[in-house]
A protein has these predicted regions:
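Short, low-complexity disordered leader/linker segments with a strong preference
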Residues: 1-67
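N-terminal (or domain-start) structured segment
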Residues: 47-123, 129
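An extracytoplasmic/periplasmic, membrane-proximal ligand-sensing/linker region
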Residues: 64-68, 82, 210, 214, ...
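Extracytoplasmic
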Residues: 65, 94, 104-107, 114, ...
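Bilobed "Venus flytrap"/periplasmic-binding protein-like clamshell domains
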Residues: 65-93, 97, 155-221, 331, ...
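Acidic, polar ligand-binding/catalytic clefts
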Residues: 117-153, 235
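Pocket-lining segment of extracytoplasmic ligand-binding domains
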Residues: 124-126, 134-137, 165, 201-293, ...
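Ligand-binding clefts/hinges and TM-proximal coupling segments of bilobed small-molecule sensing domains
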Residues: 176-193, 264-337
């Protein structure tokens, strides 16, 4: 796969976009995530040259020798086209690149740690659990080789069901068959944490460890009662469900939500706006940011150079998906990141005036 040509990569991106319309040093002090920002002015997307006028990145000759594999996600999801656009942007800057389809967050974290990817998309809650060896990663060695490159877009945790189940709140999931995501995936980590905030464990439900697309198919066949989905908005699979069935988007609200965001600062309160799906009113919920991971052992110069390339070709990335267009921008690319930045990223963001 690492031998993909630029033409094949572009072709794969087109297919993916057609399939979807819509997860170092010491840990910094927790910060409350901000709401997703509005798009910045286009002029802000051009990185400034560091003081002295010379880039701290690579030369053209050095860049041409490097190969970057970008860890994305399933071809049916949002990670794939956006990750593919990152690969294209870096290719336009002079790198050889490949966008690798994966099972998303969980596999991307492992691929970074194994050295199978240079950069990869992942949800920050799972990343921080891996980094601190807590939650789903309890008992494992802390993943101290993970570093952050930049913040990406918010993933909204969505709980969907159909009207005939009678499920209208999280507490109604007790005794029900629930699609919680593939085992140890970003979605499954979200599901487990949210259920716990409401005092529910997997012993109280019948968990189905399936990717949300498969779980929604089971729900259509009456073999599943509710499904957790974590993605940008809107999600094409959820939209299709809402067209074909009397779908209900279950709110994640009240004391359970308060407990969740209090205990885990990478979650923030949000709403799924009215008419995102078949919901006629806003639905209370939570989101968690995706971040771009980078291998700790990459040189500072290469990481700095990758960021220069990303923002030199940011229009390529913004064109890949609505979530990227609204949320990936240099003006807020370092906000709300709790994982330590790679030193090369630290230098880039400092030189451009976004950290001090």
């Amino acid at each position: 796969m690492k031998k993909l040509t630029a033409l094949l990569l572009a072709f794969c991106m087109v297919l993916a976009l057609a399939a979807c319309g819509g997860g170092g040093g010491s840990t910094p002090a927790p910060a409350t995530p901000t709401a997703p920002a509005a798009p910045a002015a286009p002029a802000a997307a051009t990185p400034a040259a560091p003081s002295g006028g010379e880039s701290k990145g690579l030369t053209d000759a050095e860049r041409a020798k490097e190969f970057i594999t970008v860890g994305t996600g399933p071809t049916s999801g949002i990670y794939y086209p956006i990750g593919g656009a990152f690969a294209t942007a870096l290719q336009e800057y002079g790198y050889s690149t490949s966008a690798e389809a994966t099972n998303a967050t969980g596999q991307n974290i492992q691929n970074i740690l194994n050295g199978d990817c240079e950069i990869a998309i992942a949800m920050q809650d799972a990343v921080m659990q891996a980094y601190t060896a807590t939650g789903a990663y309890e008992g494992k060695d802390p993943a101290s080789d993970l570093c952050a490159l930049m913040r990406l877009w918010p993933n909204y945790v969505q709980l969907v069901t159909t009207a005939n189940t009678g499920i209208t709140k999280v507490e109604d999931l007790r005794g029900k068959r629930v699609g919680v995501g593939a085992a140890n995936s970003g979605v499954e980590i979200n599901a487990r944490m949210i259920l716990a905030a409401y005092g529910i464990t997997y012993d109280d439900i019948q968990p189905d460890y399936l990717a949300y697309g498969e779980a929604i198919d089971n729900m259509k066949n009456g073999q599943c009662d509710a499904v957790f989905v974590t993605s940008g908005l809107p999600n094409a699979t959820v939209m299709e469900l809402g067209v074909q069935y009397d779908m209900v988007v279950v709110p994640i609200d009240g004391a359970g939500r308060d407990k969740l965001v209090s205990e885990y600062p990478y979650y923030a309160k949000s709403v799924i706006p009215a008419n995102t799906y078949n919901n006629t009113e806003d639905v209370e919920g939570v989101f968690v940011y995706n971040i771009m991971l980078v291998r700790k052992d990459l040189s500072d110069a290469m990481v700095y150079d990758m960021l220069e390339g990303i923002f030199a070709n940011i229009s390529t990335i913004k064109a890949s998906h609505n979530a990227a267009d609204k949320n990936i921008d240099i003006t807020f690319g370092v906000d709300d990141i709790q994982l330590p930045l790679h030193p090369g990223a630290q230098a880039f963001w400092a030189d451009n005036g976004y950290i001090h």
